[in-house]
Amino acid sequence: NEAAPITCTFVNEYQAPKLRVEKSIEANGGANGATSFNVDYKIVATNDGSLAANTGKLTDKPDFAKGLEIQSAKIAETQAGLDSASNATATNGVYTLTDGVELAAGASKEYWIRFAVTRNPAAAGYSEADLACSVNGNNEKAPGKGLFNEVLAENGKDSDGTSNNKACGPTVPHDFVVIKAGTQ
């Protein structure tokens, strides 16, 4: 009686975190032509990998059209939380959303940022044409146009690239002048 050989095969699946970050504009008070308004952006960090990972520092960099002036900024973990959030301070024009948070495999974390904005047609470089969003040669939203805003992730912390890290909303001025003409 001879024993049959047994072949064992082990398959080791590579375990790794896989972080991605994306941004969207969720509320644009400037779309109706208001001079002073709020604009809300949602940032979502997701771990699509099989191991927990830290998001690393996530920052928010608005680059609005000239004349769209930020009066204040608030950061919260929910859109409703923005109403009671304290004012955030920018460092060199960049707001810190988080210094890093641990995300379990398959987990997501939301951050919200709200800017109170005033449209100032007297600002240097103001152009109504720049109040609309536009795209650059890579078909990505262009900075310095409309309510352009970008979330920045640390190197290696955004597996799906930066093209979905940009959001923009237009502002539409509704300034008009009525001239009356009459005869007697």
Positions of predicted regions on the chain:
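Exported/extracytosolic protein signature
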Residues: 1-184
